[in-house]
Amino acid sequence: KFHGAVVDHCGHEHTRVFAEIADLGKLLAQMDDIVGTTAPARVALVYDWENRWALEDAQGLCNVNKKYVETVMDHYSALWRRGVSMDIVDQASDFAGHDVLIAPFSYMLRGDFALRVDEFVQAGGTFVATYGTGYVDDSDLCFLGGFPGPLKKTLGLWAEEIDVLMPGMENHAQLDGARYALTDYAELVHPEGAKVLAAYEEDFYAGMPALT
């Protein structure tokens, strides 16, 4: 019985809440020019169910939780906190109208996704990939010739192997004067045209590229 209301138990409009709601109505009336308009997202973030299923079924990497969803959400959250709007797409979606395509942990490359990614990059788009990209095709068969399969040329690198970091384990890398902790996975890659931006600091792959 004591919940708030625009018109409270007093029964009249001479209250703070009523005045604020009235002011809000006046403000909304001034926004007719933007009603119905949209701001198209320039960034597309890939969340792909078939890739998720393939990862969850893979008898390798971490058998408890491979953290595909968490990896996608980490990318989403980082952009959302900076006010960047995104379209959530899957690998079969049309992403040609975007400037940036982010495809975290794309273990499975379905259909012509890799081809369309390459065309997207050739047309000036920016493609962001992570560890664990391009290991199997849409029949869940490993790509021959090295990972990330058909994206090797596009990304300008060859992934030799991937190391799983157990909970609590970290490696580190420095970028622009800041030192970052690396968790979950560490992929050993060899640049084949890609520019190395940061390198691992520890373990047997110290000095190898961590970010290109």
Where are these regions (language model features)?
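Carbohydrate-binding surfaces of carbohydrate-active enzymes
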Residues: 1-212
